[in-house]
Amino acid sequence: MTVFLGIYRAVYAYEPQTPEELAIQEDDLLYLLQKSDIDDWWTVKKRVIGSDSEEPVGLVPSTYIEEAPVLKKVRAIYDYEQVQNADEELTFHENDVFDVFDDKDADWLLVKSTVSNEFGFIPGNYVEPENGSTSKQEQAPAAAEAPAATPAAAPASAAVLPTNFLPPPQHNDRARMMQSKEDQAPDEDEEGPPPAMPARPTATTETTDATAAAVRSRTRLSYSDNDNDDEEDDYYYNSNSNNVGNHEYNTEYHSWNVTEIEGRKKKKAKLSIGNNKINFIPQKGTPHEWSIDKLVSYDNEKKHMFLEFVDPYRSLELHTGNTTTCEEIMNIIGEYKGASRDPGLREVEMASKSKKRGIVQYDFMAESQDELTIKSGDKVYILDDKKSKDWWMCQLVDSGKSGLVPAQFIEPVRDKKHTESTASGIIKSIKKNFTKSPSRSRSRSRSKSNANASWKDDELQNDVVGSAAGKRSRKSSLSSHKKNSSATKDFPNPKKSRLWVDRSGTFKVDAEFIGCAKGKIHLHKANGVKIAVAADKLSNEDLAYVEKITGFSLEKFKANDGSSSRGTDSRDSERERRRRLKEQEEKERDRRLKERELYELKKARELLDEERSRLQEKELPPIKPPRPTSTTSVPNTTSVPPAESSNNNNSSNKYDWFEFFLNCGVDVSNCQRYTINFDREQLTEDMMPDINNSMLRTLGLREGDIVRVMKHLDKKFGRENIASIPTNATGNMFSQPDGSLNVATSPETSLPQQLLPQTTSPAQTAPSTSAETDDAWTVKPASKSESNLLSKKSEFTGSMQDLLDLQPLEPKKAAASTPEPNLKDLEPVKTGGTTVPAAPVSSAPVSSAPAPLDPFKTGGNNILPLSTGFVMMPMITGGDMLPMQRTGGFVVPQTTFGMQSQVTGGILPVQKTGNGLIPISNTGGAMMPQTTFGAAATVLPLQKTGGGLIPIATTGGAQFPQTSFNVQGQQQLPTGSILPVQKTANGLISANTGVSMPTVQRTGGTMIPQTSFGVSQQLTGGAMMTQPQNTGSAMMPQTSFNAVPQITGGAMMPQTSFNALPQVTGGAMMPLQRTGGALNTFNTGGAMIPQTSFSSQAQNTGGFRPQSQFGLTLQKTGGIAPLNQNQFTGGAMNTLSTGGVLQQQQPQTMNTFNTGGVMQELQMMTTFNTGGAMQQPQMMNTFNTDGIMQQPQMMNTFNTGGAMQQPQQQALQNQPTGFGFGNGPQQSRQANIFNATASNPFGF
């Protein structure tokens, strides 16, 4: 089977981009050798006609080629089974049909067998056209005239150019004789066996090797049946040309009448040789002439001769009529062919001259044009060694090139006698052979000798001559049939003799080349002895000579190193040597890199294995089949005896988690993995009750397996599968942590005994905190402060203090899963201490030092009974509890910022403050307003007043300042009814504190100034437009924002404005400026020390001031009372002092967090001190997690006499969010955002 997968034709021309690719032209014929399964690049070989032509192999894109068209069909007329090259030739039988793809070479057709579907070559004379219409005889002239597609180059040594000369005229007698002989046509029936196959190129190397340049030089085998040939021919043609006589080989023509055989047809023709030319003149057709160097192959078999020419290509099979004529033609062609070789003639010429010779010892590369490139072992003639001692002019014996060579690179040869004798012997042999007739009898068999024997053992080699007679052997193009004669010794033809050198350069012999077979070179020495030398023993130069003569490739016998090669082109040889050396270095470098990579990978793998084993030894216990168990146990947190602890450890090690998972219904494939995870985490059997979903998920269990395990555990321990809300979920203002709507519901109690004060120790009320989870952002109930009850009442006395001493209701404990806050961390400022209560008006006995109550959770809706005769006291929700006392006709100002109005009759809702409950006292008939922030109140329809709050004023007593934002006007409210909740520009809602108080004007007494924001107001000293007027006393300053207030008369107190400069036109004024908020300080009876700063340190003007651990400035309670001044973010703090010394100090910073909406936060602290020292710290934290929050804050403190000291806060605690901010009682009604309107934004 051949190696050809198909015959293709190039559709487009392609230029190679890499050395592995093949250059093709359009319509080139290609043999497909290999198809690629990865890409579209196929390996092909280009068809080239000619014996010396190389058929290149390479890659071409499959889209550039297509299957070659079929030219015709032929049928086999003989069987062909003995193939010469099984890789390219097909075996077939008679009557097999073939598709012909190429018939340019008439001797070998490129076909496809229709029987076996194989591609390859078949002999052209073994087939005929299938239809029989076209004969080979008619196709022969066309085939003869068709030139080769790529003619093979002539031997490099051939220098004779062909010239077109007509054949010489013939004598009349010769012409008549030839004409008479031509009439005698040979009998076709006498040719029994099939015709011999023509000589064609053969490739000795593998066709699949892409790097090897296969030279197709297929030569027919020469067969001989026995030593004695049959001398009886069909006809005997005796020509006068047989007796050539003495003549010059290049001056006289030799002519023979021959018969050309094409298939089964025979045509008469004439063959002439002379003047270095060969003429073939057919009887019918065009004559052809070739120079002797165009003859690439010639061979004979009995009476048949095979000639192959190039330029133009033609393969001839001639029938000479008898074997003698055939041998004569072969001898003459051999002489002409040998004489035409320039290297042979040059060797004879050089040998005839007496020149100084030398042998090259080292390689030398020419660097200039006048230098000569030589290699070690080359033989040179020393032309001039006198001109320079260092550089000699030398000439290569082989190529004839001359140039300068370093003298130390050449070793001269001193034996001149041997050279002269050799030259004289060659000349004598040439003269002797020229006198002999060209037709000589030669032995047909080839001599065989021992390849390892020395060339000098001629007698030993001559004894074995003729021992292989009778065997069929393949002959080269220069081999001829000879008859062995033991009586006489033949001598070689001096024209064909040359000097042969072995590979080591030790032995040299002058001999004629006979042939090459089975890896041996047959030579005929000058002394007549025939020897056979192994091809691998000869030098590369001699092997190249044999390749040129025979057309066979002997690459496998050549030496690998380029040191001994003596090619005609030394530069190409040196380049090839360097290329091979570079490739070898690259291969070696790649090999080292691969070895290094393998070593590094091996080392890394070893380190990884060591680390893995170390981790396994560290984490896992020794493996006990079938499953690993843990040798260490979880540290026992309970105090058990050592023996019991060891027993527990042993039992935990023995627990079979694999069986546990099987009982849970887990798949067997996952049980082992879960078991390993449990053992690695050192889980024991006593930990089963603590296993939960998150733990199982962390240990790598699947969701379905988690459900199975938890069901098994619940069933095992008798637990109910109750879904609990995650403890770390957080809600917002309107929704619960589970996503449901936030409904303010609280359990109602009907037992008044639960409102009584209860004696509880701080240790009993403080729950244990858990540090396992960080629940800083979790919604928690209000903190419980540790109350220090100074007096314990067991029965009612009938005073207001009894109500204030009541203990709030404690709601039921939540589930155990709900974390309890740490009361120590949430401890607010204590409200007990030096607080001096006011004297009650009623005659009921009142406690002289009422103790503040502990705060309670905002979730309760606890109420206290309140008689209608009492006046409500204000509840401060943002600061500390201050007992308030009526000193005169003052009405304590009220600040309404979305507050809850209180009903004076009926029950008074107990309100939750930031730090405790404010004890209420009444010293007069005036009503103390209550201030609440964001608390739920009775239904108050919202009323839009144009962006401001309606101030509340009283008709008697001094009017305390009203605080409003962006007030544009005042609207009187109806009396005796609830105050409508009003929509302001900042979203602040005013509340009615018990009675409707319309805005009136104060005609006597002192009027507390009014503070407004965003309104420009002017005081002219007389009547005030849209403002309360003071006609009998000094007027307090007015503070506005974004306006420049002007005071034109009277005693003016300092005014503070934003983005404006205060102007003072009369009186003494102490300006106080504040950036980011207004701080107004009024002092009517003493000196005032204002201090305005942000994040500044407080000043202590009297006594010491220790620093607390939470960054608060502690104040001394004696002497001048320092007043901590808060830092506001968009509000104002007004401090009014009517007597005594008031010192304001910087309070702690207020932190505001707004994460999901718009927050407007206004803070205002108004302090009135009429006679004494007051110290008031304030700290406010606001958290808004979702939605819109408007949080105004205002703290009003009234101190009419005596010393009042409020303790410092110790910690900044988180307060619950939601409506009311945890500072007021929650209502039982529910907010519905879908019912929201402009006047009812929360949809109550």
From Swiss-Prot:
- GO-annotated biological processes: actin cortical patch assembly; cell wall organization; endocytosis; negative regulation of Arp2/3 complex-mediated actin nucleation; regulation of actin filament polymerization; regulation of Arp2/3 complex-mediated actin nucleation
Which organism was this protein described from? Saccharomyces cerevisiae (strain ATCC 204508 / S288c)
Q: Where is the signal peptide?
A: none
Identify the stretch(es) annotated as 16 X 7 AA approximate repeats of T-G-G-A-M-M-P.
868-1205
Q: Please give one Gene Ontology molecular function term for this protein.
A: cargo adaptor activity
> What PANTHER family does its record include?
ACTIN CYTOSKELETON-REGULATORY COMPLEX PROTEIN SLA1 (PTHR15735:SF19), FCH AND DOUBLE SH3 DOMAINS PROTEIN (PTHR15735)
Gene name? SLA1
What is this protein's name?
Actin cytoskeleton-regulatory complex protein SLA1
Q: Which Pfam families match?
A: PH_SLA1, SH3_1, SH3_9, SHD1
* Segments of skewed composition (Acidic residues): 226-235
Q: Which residues carry this modification: Phosphoserine?
A: S447, S449, S454, S799, S996
